[in-house]
Amino acid sequence: MDAAFLLVLGLLAQSLCLSLGVPGWRRPTTLYPWRRAPALSRVRRAWVIPPISVSENHKRLPYPLVQIKSDKQQLGSVIYSIQGPGVDEEPRGVFSIDKFTGKVFLNAMLDREKTDRFRLRAFALDLGGSTLEDPTDLEIVVVDQNDNRPAFLQEAFTGRVLEGAVPGTYVTRAEATDADDPETDNAALRFSILQQGSPELFSIDELTGEIRTVQVGLDREVVAVYNLTLQVADMSGDGLTATASAIITLDDINDNAPEFTRDEFFMEAIEAVSGVDVGRLEVEDRDLPGSPNWVARFTILEGDPDGQFTIRTDPKTNEGVLSIVKALDYESCEHYELKVSVQNEAPLQAAALRAERGQAKVRVHVQDTNEPPVFQENPLRTSLAEGAPPGTLVATFSARDPDTEQLQRLSYSKDYDPEDWLQVDAATGRIQTQHVLSPASPFLKGGWYRAIVLAQDDASQPRTATGTLSIEILEVNDHAPVLAPPPPGSLCSEPHQGPGLLLGATDEDLPPHGAPFHFQLSPRLPELGRNWSLSQVNVSHARLRPRHQVPEGLHRLSLLLRDSGQPPQQREQPLNVTVCRCGKDGVCLPGAAALLAGGTGLSLGALVIVLASALLLLVLVLLVALRARFWKQSRGKGLLHGPQDDLRDNVLNYDEQGGGEEDQDAYDISQLRHPTALSLPLGPPPLRRDAPQGRLHPQPPRVLPTSPLDIADFINDGLEAADSDPSVPPYDTALIYDYEGDGSVAGTLSSILSSQGDEDQDYDYLRDWGPRFARLADMYGHPCGLEYGARWDHQAREGLSPGALLPRHRGRTA
């Protein structure tokens, strides 16, 4: 306990010397943190060493702080060391220790605002580096000095307060800080106002910095903004200082009433116009421009019973603009004297002074002008019966001139009359029809016809008035009802079979001259009422039934139809009814009335038209069939025609699928029976692009014999040609048709188109190819002349049979 007490006294003495700043104080306090107590017991580890205080900004360096010693130093040498912030941790090099003496030195100036304390650990080691004592803690506290000025948080503080505010009204608050130790007077701040002008209207709380009003007299119209100079000082007002400003703005209140600049205003207005400005009313207001306390509102107190004037406020100038909302009439009133007042948009403060010119008079003089005519009744509505004849009076659409002091005449004309139906008297405005208006006019909307009439005066600058004339076209019952289509159908012969026949009626007239319709059997024929009955279904339909069984067939009835107009119109109309035999379901039995029903809906003219149409259709079908037949026959006359005209040798045209019979006659027998049908073609032979060319003069085809007497010569020529054919095999030799022959002798096909005309063609060389090409040679070669024809006639006279024309060798066709 004695050692601890001595340690505490030493630390207190050190702190006192440091705080008093005793010059030359260098001897540090010696600490024995490991000294044993008198009872030879060690000091506990948990025993806390009081902090070591050192002032910041100490300039005498190095400065000894403290000396530590170990009790074991008497037994041998001890090495001391320290660790922690300021030694081997940032900031490094602030503290050091003499390892032999244990003295701790301050090597750098301290700044409490950066680091207010350091916690170090002290070690005692022997020369071998072994620990002699347990580590102990050293805490070094940096003592604050008043080395920081206070600082305001803002360079300029702003505040607002209403003008005329009572004393003690809060305005704003100034705030400041000090980096020194807040637990010392170095950071004890005091606020004050250095300057605010005269009189002193504001005060500041020295501790809190709140600014408040201290007396009345704040008037925005006198001073709108106050600029105060504030000061803050530490050491409770005796230390370092700093300054700032406070800008206080006074908010406006409506403490000034608006006033007119004059007691009377004089203006002029033109009659018969509206929506125009007449003049301006000037006012003054000292309150803040643009605020509700400044904006003026005008009221017309007297002189405008009809509400013809209004006053609006110009937002830029705050002047009142007098306007006309209803047209003025010079003839009714030449002068207007208005009494006008002005107030602000915001209510006036109770303590504010009343305005001396809060009201003014406005005198308005009306100028006379040429006004347009005025129709006495506009729009004018009238009615006219449907189908009114031309010249019918419709109405008199008259107008008056409001300019009583100007003697002017009015003239009338049409501006809109789409059907050109009306005629207007230019002097009186009398309107009458000039033709009959069609009920189907597209300009008749809902039974109303609309026209526009103009009235114009004769002034130098004439004015025009527009009037609307609406004419209701009254419906007239001028049409009788008729039976509605479609025509009636069949009716059962039994009175209680089937639904009966539903009859309907229509009427071209509009309501109320149309339905309901009345259906009645003609009273001229009493027998109709005994055989038939009519029952009303609704306003437009009735049902017809037989009273008892009536004969089947066509019955001609007569109905009397009447509408509901005034006066009613009626029409007697015939009705054809077909009566048939019906089954239990009330439907006509098949074929019961088929024949008779055809006459119910067709007249004689319709039947004639139907028959004529059928006959015309039949004639057209016959003409088409004949034309097709002639066309087919004409096609059969061609060069390569059908099997009947095929005269090629053993080349048969079957014109059927699968081929025909193998053995058939290769010649056309009909041509042999009628040799006169074969004649020379008219004109030169056609140019054949698909035939061989090369000879200069083609031979004309041979002429067939015109008489049966020449048949023998013709046959002999055929036999001679067959015998002289080198390609014909011997008799009774099998023919091979699948042999395609040798290659072509010609080396090129360029000779096909080498000629320029038909005269350059020569087809006689085809005869050299054998009898199979004789037909082509006859068609395109030179004619054989009279000698060939004579042989034909000779053969015919010899009476040779057609079979002689057949070749001697016939083979099978592939």
UniProtKB/Swiss-Prot annotation:
Propeptide residues according to the Swiss-Prot or TrEMBL record: 22-60
Membrane-spanning parts: 607-626
Localization, UniProt: Cell membrane
Domain Cadherin stretches: 61-152, 153-260, 261-375, 376-481, 482-590
GO molecular function: beta-catenin binding; cadherin binding; calcium ion binding
Name listed for the protein in its UniProt record: Cadherin-15
Keyword Aminoacyl-tRNA synthetase: no
Organism field: Homo sapiens
